[in-house]
Structure formats: structure tokens, C-alpha cells
Amino acid sequence: MTLAKDIASHLLKIQAVYLKPEEPFTWASGIKSPIYTDNRVTLAYPETRTLIENGFVEAIKEAFPEVEVIAGTATAGIPHGAIIADKMDLPFAYIRSKPKDHGAGNQIEGRVAQGQKMVVVEDLISTGGSVLEAVAAAKREGADVLGVVAIFSYQLPKADKNFADAGVKLVTLSNYSELIHLAQEEGYITPEGLDLLKRFKEDQENWQEG
């Protein structure tokens, strides 16, 4: 079993991912979605957590071998980033969604030197907007951001465009396509549900029609 499939299996088993193609969720953006993901749940399961963190370490070594500091996004990327940094014996920092409104007004907490080569850790990629804002903040404060790693991606076309436009490399451990096919294989969804989930990936606005 590949790492992507193994992680997808864990996410389904521990109910970090819910699939309801016939009764969709409503995202904060207002989009009706057949999938809801809460990767914070992974922290409660040592076997899953270890699989993910070891996967991150190997992915970072392969894609970003020159990394000098790990940074987590607040809040979901912080625990994963801290564990990764510990495993790799690297410094750790975290990036706030906005600068503090008191004290020094920091947006990055920790010590990041000018030009230090950074990898940013996120738990989930939907459109990529929030993590790319974190990357921009890190660059403003002098970090040399090599790229982003995440547990899971919805593989939305908008995310592909956003990362391409920003010139930021993205590496994810698992993804939507891997998960939905495994979910059908393992009986979490029907073949009809799989068709709806495939349609959502292609067209988030009109996937329920037809």
C-alpha cells in the first residue's frame, strides 16, 4: 500500500474525513461539499500521527533537502510542525494568521534568521489561500520559503492555480482522488456516491446538477 493510500485509509477509519455526497456539508465559503475534513483528529491516534509525521519527514527530505527551519501555520500546522522539527532536529517557528496587535506585533513566533530556508506545514489544502498568506508573511519577515507540505489536499483547480501563481511548491501526503476511490473500495460510499464525489472535484459549483 502506498503512503497516500495508507493515510487515506487512516483518515477514513478514525473519522477525520466524513463523506456525505447525498447530504452535503456547507463550507464557511458557502460551497456545498460532499466532504468534510478535520485533520486535528489525527493527533488523538498515535499510530496515525506517527504515520503522518514520518511521512512528512521523508517528503521534506526528498523535496526540500536544504531545509533549515520548519514553520507551522496557526493553529492546525503547529503540532505537526513541532513534531517534524523535533524528528529532524531543526528549529521550529509558527506563523500567525495576522500580526499580534500588542507587544512587538510579530506574525512569526520563534527565531527565523534572514534568508533561512523554511518549509511551511499545513494540515489541509482546499484553495490554499490561508497557507499562501502565511508563506507571504514569512517571506516579508525574511525567510526563504522553499515550499509547503500538507497532510491532505482536496485537489481543487483553484488551489493548483493559486500555488502556481504564487510560485510555491506544494507536497501533500494524501489527496482527494486517492481517498474517494479507497472509500468506495472499502464500502464507505456507493458507486453513485463516488460519481458525485468525482463531479465535485471538477466543478464545485454545479456538481449536484445533472
UniProtKB/Swiss-Prot annotation:
Its domain of life reads Bacteria
InterPro entries for the chain: OPRT (IPR023031), Or_phspho_trans_dom (IPR004467), PRibTrfase_dom (IPR000836), PRTase-like (IPR029057)
* Binding positions for 5-phospho-alpha-D-ribose 1-diphosphate per the UniProt entry: 96, 100, 102, 122-130
* Positions contributing to orotate binding: 126
Pathway it works in: Pyrimidine metabolism; UMP biosynthesis via de novo pathway; UMP from orotate: step 1/2
Q: Provide this UniProt record's keywords sorted from A to Z.
A: Glycosyltransferase, Magnesium, Pyrimidine biosynthesis, Transferase
Q: Which reaction does it catalyse?
A: orotidine 5'-phosphate + diphosphate = orotate + 5-phospho-alpha-D-ribose 1-diphosphate
Report the EC number(s), separated by commas if there are several. Answer: 2.4.2.10
CDD domains named in the record: PRTases_typeI (cd06223)
GO molecular function terms attached to this record: magnesium ion binding; orotate phosphoribosyltransferase activity
PROSITE patterns tied to this protein: PUR_PYR_PR_TRANSFER
Cofactor needs = Mg(2+)
- The top EC class, named as a word, is transferase
Role noted for this protein: Catalyzes the transfer of a ribosyl phosphate group from 5-phosphoribose 1-diphosphate to orotate, leading to the formation of orotidine monophosphate (OMP).
**What does the annotation say about its assembly with partners?**
Homodimer.
Q: HAMAP family of this UniProt entry?
A: PyrE
Query: What's the protein here called?
Result: Orotate phosphoribosyltransferase
Name the gene.
pyrE
